[in-house]
Amino acid sequence: MNSYIYKEEDWEIVETLKSNVFKVNNKNNIVLNGNSFKTCILKIIINKDKNVWKEGQVLEKLKNIDSIVKCYGWCCNKHTTYIFIEYINGYTLEEYVLKNHPIPEKELSEIIEDLIKSLASIHEIGVIHRDLKLENVMFDKESNKWKLIDFGLSFSFSPSNDGSKCYTQCGSIGYIPPEIKLGGQCGRKSDIWIFGCLVIKMLGGELEETEIQIDGASFNNNNNKPNIWIPKIPPHASKFLQNFIQKCFFEEEVLRFDSITLIDHPFLSLFKSKGNMLYLIQRGHKRWMDITQKKKGIKIEGKTFTFEDNDNKEPFGPGIVPDGTVELIFKKTFNQRLIPGSIPSTVQILDFGVDGDSFFNQEMDDDLFLDCDLKSLTLGNAFTHTLPYFGSLCYLSLGRNRNALQNLPPTLETLKYYGEVQTDLNIKSIPHVKNLLIPFNNHSIIIDTIPPTVKYLAWGKLKDLEAIETLKNLPPSVNDLTFSCPPDVFDKIQRKHIPDSISIIIINQHVIELKNSDNSETYLKDNIVC
């Protein structure tokens, strides 16, 4: 807090911006916290609770980020708090959109990149904005930067937390994320939903709302739950931009992309460095699966134990893995027999090698995991035994064992299988899968065999044009699609073969730009990005 005592005669009101917010001149050259300035924004807040100067405290925390509006200081008396904020000579993003609509996507990508980097910076420090909208973004003509302003609804918390303990419902109509409407916790991912709404407004779209479902249950007034809505993405947005926005709108907060992952989204590279888009897409998928499914809400800092490769053939017994271990990693050559008590009950993530590359092939008895609440399991190609049933498993990576797709729990959200599926998938056994990776499966896609929750599908080879035409059997939930095909088949694939729900597609390791065009006869080979 500043030692300055507010005096009305020190300030000349130049303009009333909104209720109790003014542009003022510093008549007597008051210096606040070493800050000299001629003009500023003065916010006057009637003291009703102990957090009336919260915005000043938050801005002080963010003072070293040059894309955030500065706070010069604040002071209080018995009834009122006065906050002195940097005056930005420029215009709001709302004004810019109204004047320049439609904004070319190249320029949109530059603005979006600036803003998502600003958001990542405040999230890293431990601040959520909670009121991102066009009028709360300003272009500063002096610094030539877009800046986030108005942190009046912001919340500050420990950067080590995934979210905050802020349960208050606030924000602008149409921007409010599902978790807040449901009375839940507000965190970093809430800002991501709101950011997606902001991008829609940048496109000139309206926040028209369409009912969605969460965990298969429709929320409406008939079951005493708040209405849950997802904004409609303007159809004129390019497919890459649509995909960016889709990543902001996962209904379940933990599954939503975070600001760091969004910085690497291919839409932001489309106009400057197309050559690395394949790498960015693949890295983004892996990071998303690792953070949101493999390590979903699990605190592993200082609780990881890696067992190095060795030639020991003796059984792997109790006492080797430290008590309290949460993430247990065996290197790929490990193939000792595990005996009851060797896996601590605290283990939630268990890896044998990396995605198919492991020598481990010992039977895993149920007794081995009696007290474990395993959430993630990775097994390699060598594993040939029946998979035990793990009722809480969210992430499962399996080698090419043909019998391994048994005992799958309904809790699975990521399923990686490096064999060839011999029978149709039973979608009822995996009703919540978001990521389905079966890259060595060489069959056509049969209707009703891909769960309607899948967002990312990595298929194997579609051997001919007839198989390509089975892409129409994909559920509309699939946004990201990867598959391979013979070169002569690739040359024949047209835009009409790809479902409209697909916004990112990789074929034979080529990133293809799906044009928004009425010309369904366009060949995909003519739109290779990299």
UniProtKB/Swiss-Prot annotation:
Checking Pfam families in the record gives: FNIP (PF05725), Pkinase (PF00069)
User: Quick one: which residues bind ATP?
Assistant: 17-25, 43
Q: Where is the Protein kinase domain?
A: 11-268
Give the reactions, separated by semicolons, that this protein catalyses.
L-seryl-[protein] + ATP = O-phospho-L-seryl-[protein] + ADP + H(+); L-threonyl-[protein] + ATP = O-phospho-L-threonyl-[protein] + ADP + H(+)
Q: Which GO terms describe its cellular component?
A: cytoplasm
Q: Name the cofactor(s).
A: Mg(2+)
Q: Which organism is it from?
A: Dictyostelium discoideum (Social amoeba)
GO molecular-function annotation terms? Answer: ATP binding; metal ion binding; protein serine kinase activity; protein serine/threonine kinase activity
- Gene3D superfamilies the record matches: Transferase(Phosphotransferase) domain 1 (1.10.510.10)
Identify the catalytic residues.
131 (proton acceptor)
Q: Cross-referenced InterPro entries, in alphabetical order?
A: FNIP, Kinase-like_dom_sf, Prot_kinase_dom, Ser/Thr_kinase_AS
Lineage top rank: taxon: Eukaryota
- Keywords carried by this UniProt record: ATP-binding, Kinase, Magnesium, Metal-binding, Nucleotide-binding, Repeat, Serine/threonine-protein kinase, Transferase
Name any Gene Ontology BP term: intracellular signal transduction
| Protein name per UniProt | Probable serine/threonine-protein kinase fnkB
Check the record and name the PANTHER family matching this protein: MITOGEN-ACTIVATED PROTEIN KINASE KINASE KINASE 19-RELATED, SERINE/THREONINE PROTEIN KINASE
**Family, as annotated:** Belongs to the protein kinase superfamily. STE Ser/Thr protein kinase family.
Please give the start and end residues of each transmembrane region: none
Q: Does the keyword Transcription regulation apply?
A: no
- What's its EC? 2.7.11.1
